[in-house]
Amino acid sequence: CVCPYIDGKWDEVLELARSADLETIVSNTTEAGIAYTQGDSQFDQVPPNSFPAKLTRVLFERYKAFNGAADKGLAILSCELIDNNGKELQKCCNNYAKDWNLEPAFIDWMNNANTFCSTLVDRIVPGRIRDPKELAAMEEANGYHDAALDVGEVFGVWVIEGPAELEDKLPFKKAGVNVMVVPDVTPYKKRKV
């Protein structure tokens, strides 16, 4: 997990982009975070304003570090609550690449070596427990006080739209977690709503 605002160390984020071990980026910026506004971020800004601009900068750093090697592309899992979140993120990144006049070979690498995955998360978490009696009973059962005690439904699924080989890269199946890699999230979205 990387937060570029801890001590303002954007250079450390860019250093991670150059890591041969990096394979996956997961974003969860809220639906407002997947947005493009022309001129809001500059290539050399530290850091760029929007998440898509930051991601474009990270991808460009990686492209340069590995001389555009196709096998150094990343799986980018967008978890924002918007339709086609991966595709929307990719559109934003393309807009920034064009705004910044980045080389066509980079844009080609960004779109073909990287996989922008749309995802669907389905699990209801209603919020903090406010009933003092229920809270006390749960804390007694747990054996400790938890200031942020919450509950969630037992059912949960994360559906990732991507190539089948992504399932082998991600450790979810081995861990027994209900995560599926599918060619299209649409049927799962329809089932959810």
Enumerate the language-model features and the residues they cover.
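Substrate/ligand-engaging "lid" and interaction regions
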Residues: 1-193
